[in-house]
């Protein structure tokens, strides 16, 4: 055991360190409260762990950590690959204070192509015979095809739009497909071939589907060659209409390829990783190339960067062994051995990047090529390859197209980190936190638009809905709208929500399809599953993206800070956490919607009640009958629009009195 052990540790702990085997493994340090301080791996546990206790580290971060260690746990493993996997699983699970930690991100989105189940000959088209493309996140079903992963939801939806334009595949849900009697708007704008009403044969649709799969796999040139051959064959047979269809498809595909000229690299699947460190913060920008197409990028911001730096450096020194010192004697051989010089210490950027690679690729498929802005430890790549069972190459100084990709990733990492530093402690930080939590686009947070709806009434009287707008990191008061709700059963909040969403988005959806308007990035409804289900029905009817909808559900006991988000597209509920910046923004927007709704409702109710004095002027109408009438018809306007027969159906109102009320209000 080393002589210079720190005196602040118990003999039992020091004895445990001295007894460690010289084998690969993972170690954990704990403080007096049982909190995890650090998780590390080592190819030699005895050598690595002893290095922490061999000297006094002073007032450094390592010194502060070491003085807090009261307990240690170790796990011996068979290989470095196994140690890598265990270490990073523990880091994600235990959230140690002195490890560089990347947030355990939600599962990546995929593009889903549903399975085919042929229909009977001569029968009407059925949805299962015509695969649909869809945005998907969750557990994979083997019967369907999945393409990805994609860096963000918008990358999936952008790809879906390309497939609609070029191959005209359907995106509608099966229930909508099976109940269509005529083509929808997507057919009119040439983004669907209308298989729902038999405008395309199953054979032709299957061919379009196969070409779409090849496009996603990067076989674009092969598709163009085949389409050209078929077009010429149709022209030779004087089938000019079919030839024109293929020409248009080739033109659409060529336009897509021209617009994405940056994606013409020869690589099929590559991840580009760039890191930037500044001001005690770090950003790793991950750009993804799949099937030869650049799908966009995604920033990651680790925590504990400053704490972990010195500790990681000490680990690296321990791995290098004795180096750079004087000659050592070897008594067994009777000769002097000069140690190899130690390799240069790793930069902070390299430490952050290696932490990202080790943690990120535990649950995410690893492409065969990683293009990195910093040199990556060969042992890490070897362990990752052993873990995945496939060959992985890490390239530090790329050329040609890869160089362009890496330069772009480095610029984006710098921009994202600069933006993060500028936004900290501000409303922008809340916006970013919400966008990250809900997988919204981070490219232009200034343009992120959220619309929130709330319903307000008093026992069914004077029902009013509000819509408030958040954009540019602030509430946009000039865009607030109130909707008087009519023609529903008083107190039916679900019907009120249906009415306001229908009125709000019917024209807006049409304008958005024509490029004359922009839909919000997120639609919040104040309520849980019931309100979200109602919003889902409206959006399905209007052909809008269900991924836009989220409901704010009260937590247990309706306590503030326990709210959960409920989604219309089938995603699991999300609990953001009591102190979450994202929840603070959600609460701010929801409370503003509630305030705007309730003030409008009170003003409307006051007007109704002033008008309600007309009822009390009618002989036979007292407070009880007046309240019954207002509750039944929602206000004086509802009573005025009712017939005498309808008024007579209210308890306590006779036919003669109903006719008197009708005459008084007309």
Swiss-Prot record:
Query: Pfam families under this entry?
Result: GIY-YIG, HHH_5, UVR, UvrC_RNaseH, UvrC_RNaseH_dom
Q: Name one GO biological process term.
A: nucleotide-excision repair
Q: What keywords would UniProt list here?
A: Cytoplasm, DNA damage, DNA excision, DNA repair, Excision nuclease, SOS response
InterPro entries xref list: GIY-YIG_endonuc, GIY-YIG_endonuc_sf, GIY-YIG_UvrC_Cho, RuvA_2-like, UVR_dom, UVR_dom_sf, UvrABC_protein_C, UvrC
Supply one GO CC term from the record. Answer: cytoplasm
Give the source's domain of life in one word: Bacteria
The family note in this entry says:
Belongs to the UvrC family.
Q: What is this protein called?
A: UvrABC system protein C
């Amino acid at each position: 055991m080393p002589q210079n052990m720190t005196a602040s540790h118990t003999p039992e702990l020091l004895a445990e360190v001295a007894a460690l085997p010289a084998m690969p493994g993972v170690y954990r340090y704990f403080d007096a409260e049982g909190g995890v301080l650090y998780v590390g791996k080592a190819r030699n546990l005895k050598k690595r762990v002893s290095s922490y206790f061999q000297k006094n580290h002073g007032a450094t971060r390592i010194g502060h950590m070491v003085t807090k260690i009261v307990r240690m746990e170790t796990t011996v493993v068979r290989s470095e690959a196994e140690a890598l996997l265990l270490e990073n699983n523990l880091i994600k699970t235990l959230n140690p204070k002195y490890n560089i930690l990347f947030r355990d991100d939600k599962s990546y989105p995929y593009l889903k192509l549903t399975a085919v189940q042929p229909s009977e000959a001569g029968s009407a088209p059925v949805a299962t015979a015509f695969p649909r493309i869809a945005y998907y996140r969750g557990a994979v079903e083997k019967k369907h095809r999945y393409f990805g992963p994609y860096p963000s939801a918008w990358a999936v939806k952008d790809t879906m739009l390309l497939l609609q334009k070029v191959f005209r595949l359907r995106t509608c849900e099966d229930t909508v497909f099976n109940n269509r009697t005529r083509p929808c708007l997507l057919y009119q704008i040439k983004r669907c071939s209308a298989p729902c009403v038999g405008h395309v044969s199953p054979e032709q649709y299957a061919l379009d589907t196969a070409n779409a799969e090849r496009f996603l796999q990067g076989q674009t040139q092969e598709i163009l060659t085949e389409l050209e051959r078929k077009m010429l064959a149709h022209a030779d047979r004087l089938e000019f209409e079919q030839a024109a269809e293929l020409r248009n498809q080739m033109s659409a595909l060529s336009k897509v390829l021209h617009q994405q000229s940056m994606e013409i690299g020869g690589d099929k699947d590559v991840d580009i990783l760039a890191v930037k460190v500044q001001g005690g913060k770090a950003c790793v920008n991950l750009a993804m190339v799949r099937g030869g197409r650049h799908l966009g990028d995604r920033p990651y911001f680790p925590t504990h960067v400053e704490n972990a730096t010195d500790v990681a450096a000490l680990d690296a020194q321990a791995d290098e062994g004795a180096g750079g010192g004087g000659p050592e004697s070897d008594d067994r051989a009777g000769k002097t051995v000069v140690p190899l010089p130690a390799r240069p210490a790793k930069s902070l950027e390299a430490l952050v990047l290696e932490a990202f690679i080790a943690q990120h690729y535990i649950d995410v498929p690893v492409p065969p090529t990683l293009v990195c802005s910093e040199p990556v430890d060969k042992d890490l790549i070897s362990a990752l390859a052993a873990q995945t069972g496939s060959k992985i190459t890490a390239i530090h100084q790329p050329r040609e197209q890869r160089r362009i990709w890496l330069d772009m990733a480095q610029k984006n990492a710098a921009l994202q980190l600069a933006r993060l530093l500028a936004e900290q402690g501000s409303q922008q930080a809340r916006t970013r936190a919400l966008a990250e939590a809900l997988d919204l686009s981070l490219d232009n947070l200034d343009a992120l638009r959220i619309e929130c709806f709330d319903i307000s009434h008093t026992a069914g009287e004077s029902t009013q809905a509000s819509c408030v707008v958040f954009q540019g990191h602030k509430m946009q008061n000039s865009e607030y709208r109130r909707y008087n709700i009519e023609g529903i059963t008083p107190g039916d909040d679900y019907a009120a929500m249906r009415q306001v969403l229908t009125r709000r988005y019917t024209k807006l959806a049409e304008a958005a399809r024509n490029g004359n308007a922009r839909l919000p990035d997120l639609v919040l409804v104040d309520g849980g599953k019931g309100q979200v289900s109602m919003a889902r029905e409206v959006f399905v009817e209007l052909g809008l993206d269900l991924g836009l909808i989220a409901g704010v559900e009260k937590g247990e006991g309706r306590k503030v800070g326990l709210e959960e988000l409920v989604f219309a597209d089938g995603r699991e509920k999300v609990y953001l956490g009591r102190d979450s910046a994202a929840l603070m923004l959600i609460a701010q927007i929801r409370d503003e919607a509630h305030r705007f709704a309730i003030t409008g409702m009170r003003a409307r109710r006051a007007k109704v009640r002033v008008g309600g004095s007309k009822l009390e002027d009618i002989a036979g109408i007292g407070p009880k009958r007046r309240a019954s009438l207002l509750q039944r018809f929602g206000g004086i306007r509802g009573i005025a629009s009712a017939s005498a027969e309808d008024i007579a159906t209210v308890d306590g109102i006779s036919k003669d009195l109903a006719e008197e009320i009708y005459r008084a209000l007309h």
